[in-house]
């Protein structure tokens, strides 16, 4: 790739992360694939989402010192990565299902374009360049406003006939009282807050406040966090026993809080998995807030 000065430069790629509340995108160079060298962020509009995405992509193309080689996109919902289309979606983005992301953007940008689910893309980046880079078979677990996941084998997302491989939010776990519940209802940020407030003398506004109480030594906060993350880990331990992986990487806003989350989760994984997979490493994600963009850029490089 040659820049305007005539010197050869590493290829650059655009990674886009479409979310329910924001669209983030950036330029990533092959020479330094974990660094975002140009960054844009916009609120997600209620309509014409792809028009907003196209505008951001054009801004990045204009800002790039060399020609952009590929575009990779992570988007919410079940995504058909072959067609680059939204197969189904939740209530966060009304009317999103059926959106032909790749075809629409190819009409404006004559570049290779790849699209996949946003959490899968984040897990891909983390598996290739982050905490999972030493492992061939990775389960990425995202604990944030929801619960999601990705299965990565040999540097690629596992393909599946209905495009849901790695989806974790519909897994069930066993709560401390013996009842069963969806992981998302008790291991996501809102889920943990709901579990805490169910029996709290002084309800908390959100998980951030609960963690402040945890670190201040409140026993009830500690019990809620440890018991529910342990329960989540047990469920994931059973899941990895069925699919077999080399490592479990934990990311997302909750998953990257630190040892208070990772340690009970890892104990649960060891308790719920059968030997010898109960000894696989459980590692906190490393790439930070730009993981979705890094992963999307890599998706574009390999699948675009």
Give residue spans per PLM region.
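Short, small/polar residue-rich loop motifs at catalytic or cofactor-binding pockets
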Residues: 21-22, 144-146
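A charged helix-plus-loop insertion that forms the helical arch/lid used to bind
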Residues: 85-97
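Short loop/edge segments at beta-strand edges and connector loops
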Residues: 115-119, 123
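ATP-binding/phosphotransfer module of carbohydrate and carboxylate kinases, centering on a glycine-rich
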Residues: 1-70, 80-85, 105-113, 125-137, ...
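A cytosolic small-molecule/anion-sensing beta-strand core signal
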Residues: 75, 153-154
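Short secondary-structure boundary segments
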Residues: 75, 143-145, 247, 252-253
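Active-site glycine-centered loops adjacent to acidic/histidine catalytic or metal-binding residues
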Residues: 17, 118, 144
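Structural signature of FAD isoalloxazine-binding scaffolds in flavoprotein oxidoreductases
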Residues: 164-168
